[in-house]
């Protein structure tokens, strides 16, 4: 499973990139809105200068024709831009049109397997099932990863699964075990993955022994 960082903060992206494991970035309007004094397109240019893997940039429009035009403009920013499209009927139309133009797409806000299958059939490069938000309403978001992976394997679909709305390290482990191709997560979760109390204890013991 590959690691994406879910942020529009350029300092966090640089920090994640320095770890040597970063394969891409996902952004959304809420994350971009937190970034003051920079335009959306300028921030995307900054991000694509740092990260050479996929950078998902979400459209704001909700009508198919407007999403298509917005997606084409976003794709001009850099060759590694992936246009992020919400899972709606108009979104599917936009995905098909952009795919036919050779533009990569990431269908977001996936909450059931039927939505993922529709997105894949429309030509989506990626689908993003949301784990944490399903957990919030009493569902098991990880079961959705398993369902989507099984359906895609049965039908030979190449669309990749991005496990999104990851809240903690256990989400990462389980998403990887269930076959997600990518996990996108906040920087704090990436850092949490590096930690274990026995690792810290072992380092302390090694240093204590060395300094005897």
Swiss-Prot record:
Pfam families found in the cross-reference section: TAL_FSA (PF00923)
Biological process terms in GO annotation: carbohydrate metabolic process; pentose-phosphate shunt
The enzyme's E.C. designation: 2.2.1.2
Coiled-coil stretches: none
Source species: Bacillus subtilis (strain 168)
The UniProt record lists the keyword Metal-binding: no
Protein's name in the database: Transaldolase
Primary subcellular site in the record, as a coarse category: cytoplasm
PROSITE patterns in UniProt: TRANSALDOLASE_1, TRANSALDOLASE_2
């Amino acid at each position: 499973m590959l690691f994406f960082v879910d942020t529009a903060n350029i300092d966090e992206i640089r920090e994640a990139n320095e770890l040597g494991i970063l394969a891409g970035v996902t952004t959304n309007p809420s994350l971009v809105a937190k970034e003051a004094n920079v335009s959306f397109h300028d921030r995307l240019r900054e991000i694509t200068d740092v990260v050479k893997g996929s950078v998902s940039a979400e459209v704001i429009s909700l009508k198919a024709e407007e999403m298509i035009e917005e997606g084409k403009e976003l794709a001009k920013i850099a060759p590694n831009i992936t246009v992020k499209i919400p899972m709606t009927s108009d979104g599917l139309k936009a995905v098909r049109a952009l795919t036919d133009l050779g533009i990569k797409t990431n269908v977001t806000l996936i909450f059931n397997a039927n939505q993922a299958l529709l997105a894949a059939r429309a030509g989506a490069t990626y689908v993003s099932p949301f784990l944490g938000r399903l957990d919030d309403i009493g569902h098991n978001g990880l079961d959705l990863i398993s369902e989507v992976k099984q359906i895609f394997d049965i039908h030979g679909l190449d669309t990749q699964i991005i496990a999104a709305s990851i809240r903690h390290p256990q989400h990462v482990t389980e998403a990887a075990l269930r076959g997600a191709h990518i996990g996108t997560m906040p920087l704090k979760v990436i850092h949490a993955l590096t930690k274990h109390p026995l690792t810290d204890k072992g380092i302390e013991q090694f240093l204590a022994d060395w300094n005897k």
